[in-house]
């Protein structure tokens, strides 16, 4: 273990949700794609790499990009929630914008924002379907179409548990181990 000495002057640092590494190993900041069918928000962490307080402010390229904080002062870090005004964003499958974060010392970091807002299918048509988002599809386990069980292994739906408010348990966790080789 070793102590890290902070620089005496404030210095701007930015990390966007979904980034695997700090900038330096990656050449730009970008949030995951906003999807009209999911209407989610993402975050950006603004942090201070120095010992004195950091003053910062934000600027967006489009009025449909909404931020929870437009400016601030921090000695450690602050989180900005970013969302989309879906009534103002233009229709299209790859709408782009940027969010700039500037320090009072002249430092600037840009975060790229992309939006998936197709005209068709409508939000109402997609209401009960599973939607791909940023390269994956998340399905509620209890919404299975069919199940295959045997005498020893049953699927048990557990209400009021999990992200979608239902979960599925496979088998009895207290039962002896099953040998399924050769099936």
Task: Label every PLM stretch briefly.
Residues 49-81:
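Surface-exposed binding patches on compact interaction domains or structured appendages
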Residues 79-95:
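Extracellular/luminal low-complexity segments enriched in Ser/Thr/Pro
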Residues 119-153:
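Extracellular carbohydrate-recognition regions
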Residues 150-167:
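Short, polar loop/linker segments at the starts of domains and inter-domain junctions
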């Amino acid at each position: 273990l070793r102590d890290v000495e902070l620089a005496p002057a404030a210095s701007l640092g930015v990390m966007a949700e979904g980034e695997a590494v700090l900038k330096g190993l990656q050449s730009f900041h970008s949030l995951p794609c906003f999807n009209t069918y999911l209407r989610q928000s993402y975050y950006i962490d603004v942090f201070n790499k120095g010992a004195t307080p950091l003053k910062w402010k934000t600027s967006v390229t489009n009025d449909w990009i909404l931020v929870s904080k437009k400016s601030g002062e921090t000695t450690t870090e602050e989180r900005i929630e970013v969302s989309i005004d879906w009534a103002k964003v233009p229709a299209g499958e790859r709408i782009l914008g940027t969010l700039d974060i500037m320090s009072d010392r002249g430092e600037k970091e840009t975060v790229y924002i992309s939006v998936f807002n197709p005209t068709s299918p409508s939000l109402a048509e997609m209401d009960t379907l599973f939607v791909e988002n940023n390269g994956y599809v998340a399905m509620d386990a209890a919404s299975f179409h069919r199940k295959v069980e045997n005498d020893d292994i049953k699927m048990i739906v557990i209400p009021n548990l999990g992200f979608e408010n239902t979960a599925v348990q496979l088998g009895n966790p207290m039962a002896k181990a099953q040998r399924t080789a050769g099936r």
